Regions:
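Aromatic- and glycine-rich peptidoglycan recognition patches
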Residues: 2-12, 26-27, 31-33, 86, ...
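Generic helix-packing signal
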Residues: 42, 49, 73-76, 115, ...
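Bacterial N-terminal signal peptides
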Residues: 13-23
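Extracytoplasmic low-complexity, Pro/Thr/Ser/Ala/Gly-rich segments
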Residues: 34-49, 53
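Catalytic cysteine-centered active-site loop
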Residues: 51-110, 151
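Generic alpha-helical structural context detector
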Residues: 13, 43-46, 70-74, 133
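Short beta-strand segments that buttress and anchor functional surface loops
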Residues: 111-118
């Protein structure tokens, strides 16, 4: 048996419109403006693109590979995550992390470190198979497999990643009528 409720169509239409409006609303500005530590480290490293390579340089106008890593973490306030700057070479950073934080290619996250040549070269993992490091041509973004030295390891630094936002269903407006047969 079918019953007609006066005004039900208008109410259902209004509820649907409200649901669509609420679910299409952008994320709150506070959440969008709160970058993770990893994105801060990466943004600082990216800002150095094009700076020249110089052996032993730690910035801000020239870098070697470990100098870029140390500078990026230091400027982001995360130097404690990579040994407080006490490890000044790629091989020293590799030795520091070798037994503390190795991770796999599939589990590596942006902000982790990438090591090539058993510690002869180091960079920052950007995600998607890409890294940023200081090559002899300067600070560059490149594929992890583009470095001529053989890949050695991904190293987990513990840099904070923003969690993915959970999917929350839109609330049903109060006073809604659910009509069932």
């Amino acid at each position: 048996m079918r019953r007609t409720i006066p005004g039900a169509r208008a109410l259902v239409s209004a509820a649907l419109a409200a649901t669509l409006f609420i679910s299409a609303a952008p994320a709150t500005p506070a959440a969008a403006a709160d970058p993770s530590e990893a994105s801060q480290v990466i943004a600082i490293a990216r800002a150095q693109r094009g700076d020249p390579w110089r052996y032993g340089a730690t910035g801000p106008s020239a870098f070697d590979c470990s100098g870029l890593v140390i500078y990026s973490y230091k400027m982001a306030g995360d130097l404690s995550l990579i040994g407080n700057g006490n490890y000044r070479s790629a091989s020293a950073l590799y030795k520091y992390f070798r037994d503390r934080g190795r991770t796999s290619r599939t589990a590596a996250t942006p902000g982790d470190l990438v090591v090539w040549g058993n510690g002869r070269h180091i960079g920052i993992y950007l995600g998607g198979g890409m890294a940023i490091s200081t090559l002899t041509s300067g600070v560059r973004i490149h594929a992890v497999n583009a470095v001529t030295a053989p890949f050695t390891a991904y190293l987990r630094t513990g840099v904070y990643q923003l969690p993915k936002a959970p999917v929350v269903p839109a609330p049903v407006p109060s006073g809604s009528v659910v009509v069932s047969r």
